[in-house]
């Protein structure tokens, strides 16, 4: 995929090194620039920002670092992403001097089919779960309480689907 993107963008490997705007313009997801802009504005107004995600949000952190943002940039992710060697979020966060929080929702031991499936890798991240879990912890909620709430909402969704 990377090679196809480089060919389509007329970039060579490393051709935009040190030039994140060029890399983003040629190969990046436009939402990354939007997220970086929102975050930059929030940080300038002294609004707390937490990036909930993995590699994509670390790309936003990289854009902010290249833009000269020196503030603490917290990134919250799940143990699923932290354990993924292809994502390498811990090393990326360290390279970008981002404050990484990793939370484990404890789905692996769950008897609930959706959570057990998630723990087996049947679902993909992309729902800001790491940020939600980090905020839940800060609010004093246990992961058991979070799992119970997920089961309750999941049950309501399944029940409403079966009524259709």
Language model segments and positions:
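N-terminal loops that bind phosphate or other acidic moieties
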Residues: 1-164
